[in-house]
Amino acid sequence: MFTRRFLAVLALGASLVFTAACGNGGNTAKEKTDITFFGSSTLAPVVTKAGTAFTEQYGKWNKADSSLPDADIVINVTSGGSGAGIKALLDGTADFGLVAREVKSSEKEKIKNYQEYKVGIDALTIAVNPNNPIAKIKDTLTSDQIKKIFSGEYKTWNEVDPSLPSTEIVVVTRDLGGGAHEVFQEKIMGDTKVTDKAIQAPSMGALVAKIIENENAVGYASYGVAKQNEGKIFALKVDGVAATPETIVDGSYKIQRPLLIVGSGELTKVQKAFMDYLRSDAGQKLIEAMGFIPVK
């Protein structure tokens, strides 16, 4: 954890600094002036960067809005996966869950006065190391080929294309609690399971790092994180469609996903101030600069 005026925790599975009040809009004798976010390893760095920018600009809440308390801005962000973000919200250990997938109906039903704030759009790219020979002879894979690679039916690269070497395919995925895993399972795998030989990365950054360090690796990399590592990984088209802002937004690129902040109850004044910043032109430009697609 680092401490200035902005506090952020990005250790996977780390405990939160404090216990959040139940619900976002509960009335207390003294208004709560810190905000806690927990969840998606894709979205957590975005909220962290936005929190840093917001804090550096204002420092205290009343500098952002004169009606807010004269108190330091304190924002806590912890990365632990989308499912863990929902759980933290339900447990009351976070004010907001960070979710990089659609929230399930069963999850919404458990959250009192469910609130959802869409701050960006992402996609999953099928990424390989640029030194992988497939990057030189193919620029696209079919959904069926991707399924066979990730299920382990294709074990060596020459099974994908006979001109490729007979080296072992190294499959890299997010851990099962990550939003990316659920999106990939729904959009590509269906009822077919990912091979149990897959390397499960604890974060999207770790997944991309595995692809960068192993030329035989393949994984589903966040579009935003892939953009941050441009030149270090090679993104294949899916069914002939490249992942671009246009194809992701219009749905022609099939493995897209929302970036959501999920809460319970009405926003407090300080929460609204930061949420408004995230969805302002400045906040959306920051999200775009990190490689993701803004919602406005």
Please give the residue ranges for each predicted region:
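Bacterial N-terminal signal peptides that target proteins for export
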Residues: 1-10
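C-terminal motif of bacterial Sec signal peptides marking the signal peptidase cleavage site
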Residues: 17-21
